[in-house]
């Protein structure tokens, strides 16, 4: 049985895949192109179609997830607008650096090594900090813009950056103030890395918002997704003009992610912030291993390594999304038990 020239089995696969990635996307503010594009390439789609369809999927999913985070009060629009401005400038400079390396013939090697080390480094750092229990992640889940974040809830690096009182000062969600120039500097740095590595950068921005600026983890996720709406929208529009976006891929993926993104976003208001950081770190560490395996397969001309890499990525996605879902259900059950005990008393 086929629909629009695509087998029902493949459509069902895309819907399930979209649900899985949607949960991760709504929960972490990353994972779309990181997972979709490699999967489509291994399935035999042309690189342009894979990239374009991946971007269109990221755009649609980020809109859905951002709306849910907005309902939970987890999007700082002012910070998001500033991050977009700084990130855009950084991406342009990063692209210049990448083009220079391409002219020298070093681009593939340098970018691959940098990508693996960055994924692994951020993953190790976030996991270590979460297990140490330093910095609880700011406000508890549903964030009141006028509520204050205590110093104990803000990472030391962010406290140091906040101490530079260079005007103008911007008041962010959580009641703390940060210099406009510090925000733009962090945004520029994350954009520089994104442009240099040729990736969306969600895995860079989310920890940067928390560890460098001091934004509560759920708000960091929601604000990161708000930024992705714009970057994904522009990329999708440009590729759609050339007809590279394959709707037979995008529509079933979005059908699954429409539910997954809302579930993932809702889970950020239930799951402990320490657990969020641990899951995020584990996802990046496994992603680093998968990318390293794929690159080694290319160097030694072992095609099967691409499949092994994809299995690692999909396995990581299944494992982490399952852990997220389990943690959210556990929190709901504990809350229900608590209410039942209170009612009996």
Residues of each region from the PLM?
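Small-residue-rich hydrophobic segments that form or flank transmembrane alpha-helices
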Residues: 1-103, 109-112, 118-120, 124-131, ...
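Alpha-helical membrane-embedding segments
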Residues: 74, 140-152, 242, 286, ...
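Transmembrane alpha-helices
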Residues: 114-121, 125, 298-344
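Flexible cytoplasmic inter-helical loops of multi-pass small-molecule transporters
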Residues: 131-161
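A contiguous, mid-protein "functional segment" used to position or interact
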Residues: 266-312
């Amino acid at each position: 049985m086929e629909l629009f020239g695509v087998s029902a089995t493949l459509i069902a696969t895309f819907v399930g895949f979209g649900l899985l990635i949607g949960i991760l996307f709504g929960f972490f503010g990353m994972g779309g192109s990181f997972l979709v594009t490699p999967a489509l390439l291994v399935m035999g789609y042309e690189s342009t179609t894979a990239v374009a369809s991946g971007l269109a999927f990221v755009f649609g999913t980020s809109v859905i997830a951002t709306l849910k985070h907005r309902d939970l009060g987890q999007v700082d629009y002012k910070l998001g607008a500033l991050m977009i401005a700084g990130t855009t400038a950084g991406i342009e400079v990063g692209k210049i650096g990448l083009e220079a390396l391409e002219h020298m013939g070093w681009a593939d090697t340098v970018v691959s090594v940098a990508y693996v080390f960055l994924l692994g480094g951020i993953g190790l750092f976030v996991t270590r900090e979460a297990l140490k229990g330093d910095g609880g992640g700011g406000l508890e889940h549903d964030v009141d813009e006028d509520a204050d974040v205590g110093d104990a809830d803000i990472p030391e690096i962010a406290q140091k950056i906040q101490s530079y009182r260079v005007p103008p000062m911007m008041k962010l969600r959580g009641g703390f103030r940060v210099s406009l120039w510090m925000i733009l500097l962090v945004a520029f740095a994350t954009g520089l890395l994104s442009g240099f590595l040729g990736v969306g950068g969600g895995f860079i921005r989310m920890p940067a918002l928390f560890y460098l600026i001091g934004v509560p983890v759920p708000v960091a996720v929601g604000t990161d997704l708000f930024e992705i709406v714009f970057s994904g929208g522009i990329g999708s529009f440009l590729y759609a003009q050339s007809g590279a976006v394959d709707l037979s891929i995008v529509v079933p993926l979005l059908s699954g992610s429409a539910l997954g993104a809302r579930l993932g976003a809702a889970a950020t208001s239930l799951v402990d912030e320490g657990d969020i950081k641990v899951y995020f770190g584990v996802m990046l560490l496994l992603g680093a291993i998968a990318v390293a395996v794929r690159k080694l397969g290319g160097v030694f001309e072992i095609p099967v390594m691409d499949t092994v890499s994809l299995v690692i990525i999909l396995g990581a996605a299944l494992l982490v999304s399952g852990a997220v879902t389990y943690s959210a259900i556990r929190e709901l059950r504990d809350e229900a038990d608590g209410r039942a005990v209170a009612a009996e008393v």
